[in-house]
């Protein structure tokens, strides 16, 4: 929530706006990462660590055990996926091969889109 609020939480500022932006915006056309967070691969959704329907402003992290979180400031959304990919062994790659995390994220965006179309 702190990052979604650009460094504030509960009415208190913990990170400056400048620091929050450094963490979440890529600084180079050759690297999609901010200082600490991953970003989507623009123009190549198959190579992207997040869903194809996620906006360019999204940032997050994928973990070794299959966990991930993505923060979407455009939609005021935080997507958190908890898992234990290494069970029963480190060779388990079903999360990646089945594209589970990004498919769930895209399902969230499809549901948001359906809701906004219904409300229009």
Regions found by a protein language model. Name each.
Residues 1-120:
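Catalytic loop of the DD-peptidase/beta-lactamase superfamily, centered on the K-T-G motif
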